[in-house]
């Protein structure tokens, strides 16, 4: 989050300094990188926010890739959510946004899936980004290129 904010401020011509105890502890290095409001089964305002984010992310990533000169690993690959039964699948909060899968279709999408899983939902609109290996590195490079200063090894207490 911090590097994303730093990047946007620097793009607007602001002087930015990122203070960090250890950059390797940043949320981006531990988060899974799922861009999946539908697969997560969100609802209400949180789902709407996630859906809006899915529309904005490609443009945001393109800015980072342009400024950093490297790819961020954004993939609009879809995400499959398996279920033990078709009833469970059909009751999932975001089922209406997914493509229903039966057992053979589920096996095709997830080879070797255990026999407990009998149904699934494919959320084609969901995707992922490679946080750890690509996005964070691209953000660091983009920030550096825009003049962001880094103060590593400093703990902020207040």
Could you say what each language-model-derived stretch is?
Residues 34-109:
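Dinucleotide-binding Rossmann-like beta1-alpha1 core, especially the glycine-rich loop
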Residues 2-3:
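N-terminal Rossmann-fold NAD(P) dinucleotide-binding loop
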Residues 19, 80-83, 124:
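Short hydrophobic segments within beta-strands
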